[in-house]
Amino acid sequence: MSYLSVSTWSLHRCLGPLHWTVWNESAGSHETVLQPEPQLFNLLELPALAKAKGYSAVEVCHFHMPDRSESYLADLRGAFHDAGLSFDTLLLDYGDLSSGDERRRQADFGLMMEWIDAASPA
């Protein structure tokens, strides 16, 4: 069955600040840097808006997720459920599992696993 989905990347100037992951070499860890963007609506409002426009699914970029707490993810899951919309993809647009720097490669792998754990309840 075919259906129409929209990616949050297509709306990246509407969802508020982008939460970019960067590598801090001296600390040997990831950090989040905010890039200001206008917020016309938030991620919790997106499922209902997308459904009203005829979409059946949303694909979310990790840098649009303002929070990975259990309560926020439960709210996000509820927003998708209430709208009757599918959360199809979580794009983790960061990490290099082929890095020659073992510390960085392990940190990137760990970050990916954290995102998989965060996406599971959503």
Which role does the model predict for each range below?
Residues M1-P121:
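N-terminal pre-domain/capping segments
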